[in-house]
Amino acid sequence: YKKGDIGELMQAECEYLHDCSSIWPSITYGERNHWRNNMSSVFYCTHSIGPVLFATGLRPVRVSGFETRNMDFMRKLGDPAGSAGTLILTLENGAIVKSIDMNLRRHGNNYILYGDRGVMETDRFNAKMLHIRQEREKNCTGDWVSYTPLFTDERASGAGHGGGDYFTTNYFIDRLLGNDDVKPYTIDVYQAVDMCIPGILGYRSILNKNVGIDIPNLRNKAERDAFRNDTFCTFPESAGEMYVSNDLSGKEEIPDEIFAEVERRWHAGEPG
């Protein structure tokens, strides 16, 4: 993207679909107030929108949030939130991004970026493969090129999240050690917030009939100050008086027996 092969971003779609139902006992331990049982449907958005923002260098300026209803297969495991969420972002150049996350019935990390001179996308069934199409001088002409990118550091090949766990940590440590060469590959605190705050404000949008919410640029002190005491979230220990529930189902509270059963499965090594 930074070479300009597909031009300026117009629209992107990104998915981090991870049906966690089978592993829910081993990652929540039957704890009612485990953060995964308290998060909203759109909270876990960095894995989907992060690569788009990092590749393009663009900042999100507005978000609308949507969620599915809370499905029984997750509620029976102690999760009361909407079982999947969607964010629609507007970026600073006017581009639109659609992000889909969480417990849909497949496991996939998929990205497609449409530029004004071409398109690039990951393969839906072979996550290691990339497809790129560049426009020629005449409109609607061009060829597809498909290839499998190689790791720049083979030590990443065994790391989680497609090598991302290795690279983000490695570059972060290198930067702390004073290696300026890795600066283009590191994520600073403002970029990190840009990748996660759409999920927080996206849930505010969901609670307000999916209305668009402006995303602050926290690099600017005036915009930071406007949000300094805003603790709105679904985590009671952090939100204080601004706490909102992640359960919009209208159903009765999940009984203690559910969490006891999930804890039993965890200790027994049984799936969800």
Label each residue range with its predicted role.
Residues 80-82, 87-94, 113-115:
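Active-site beta-strand termini and strand-to-loop segments that position acidic
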Residues 14-20, 67-72, 93-95, 103-105, ...:
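Glycine-rich beta-alpha junction loops
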Residues 32, 54, 62, 72, ...:
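C-terminal glycine/acidic-rich active-site capping loop/insertion
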Residues 1-79:
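Predominantly a Rossmann-like dinucleotide-binding segment in NAD(P)-dependent oxidoreductases
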Residues 198-208:
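Short arginine-rich
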Residues 46, 95-109, 161:
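Glycine-rich phosphate/pyrophosphate-binding beta-alpha loops
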Residues 48-49, 169-170, 199:
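A general structural signal for well-ordered alpha-helical segments in protein cores
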